[in-house]
């Protein structure tokens, strides 16, 4: 997955990087993941760049709603799933009905970017653009063959995400 490569590349550049692994990926539980993320709060500060993919995007937004933290440097949200998808899927419905609080999100980060593709099976183009508009974030649309921006859609090593992560 591109996240593994990004983690290794950032470590090689001697960046201070954390790549939390959340339990039970096959059957994720929002409350459990929130607890696990909260244990890392001492590492979240004004120099933090959060890069979240898919369910991680929803986790981060819920974390902000629950723990309103220090303003961070940059937030990069990649391929968020739609609420309709989350609700319709038994393994992800604990993540559904999330709140998109534009003021809270805007106040939580100096800079932000939503990255999505036009053919992500977990979120329609209309939903992604609405997501970006509600959060008042910049929006980068990847080519139509990018899918969910994961290994299944050809995203092993993804050099552009390293450039984006370092662009502060």
Predicted regions mapped to residue ranges:
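Catalytic histidine neighborhood in serine/cysteine hydrolases
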Residues: 15-18, 133-150
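Gly/Ala-rich beta-loop-alpha elbow adjacent to hydrolase catalytic centers
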Residues: 51-61
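Active-site nucleophile loop of the alpha/beta-hydrolase fold
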Residues: 22-25, 75-85
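Acidic catalytic loop of the alpha/beta-hydrolase fold
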Residues: 84, 118-123
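Catalytic histidine-centered segment of alpha/beta-hydrolase-like enzymes
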Residues: 28-29, 145-158
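Short beta-strand/loop motif that positions the catalytic acidic residue
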Residues: 108, 113-116, 120
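Conserved alpha/beta-hydrolase fold motif
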Residues: 49-51, 75
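Active-site catalytic motif of lipid deacylating hydrolases and related acyltransferases
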Residues: 1-46
């Amino acid at each position: 997955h591109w996240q593994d490569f990004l983690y290794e590349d950032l470590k090689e550049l001697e960046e201070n990087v954390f790549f939390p692994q959340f339990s039970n990926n096959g059957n994720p539980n929002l409350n459990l993941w929130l607890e696990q993320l909260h244990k890392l709060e001492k590492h979240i500060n004004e120099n933090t760049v959060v890069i979240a993919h898919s369910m991680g995007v929803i986790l981060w937004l819920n974390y902000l709603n629950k723990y309103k933290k220090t303003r961070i440097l940059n937030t990069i949200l990649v391929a968020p799933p739609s609420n309709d998808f989350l609700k319709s899927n038994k393994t992800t419905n604990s993540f559904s009905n999330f709140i998109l609080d534009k003021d809270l999100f805007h106040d939580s980060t100096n800079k932000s970017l939503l990255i999505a593709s036009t053919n992500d099976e977990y979120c329609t183009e209309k939903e992604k653009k609405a997501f970006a508009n509600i959060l008042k974030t910049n929006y980068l649309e990847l080519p139509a063959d990018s899918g969910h921006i994961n290994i299944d859609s050809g995203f092993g090593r993804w050099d552009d995400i390293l450039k984006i992560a370092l662009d502060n």
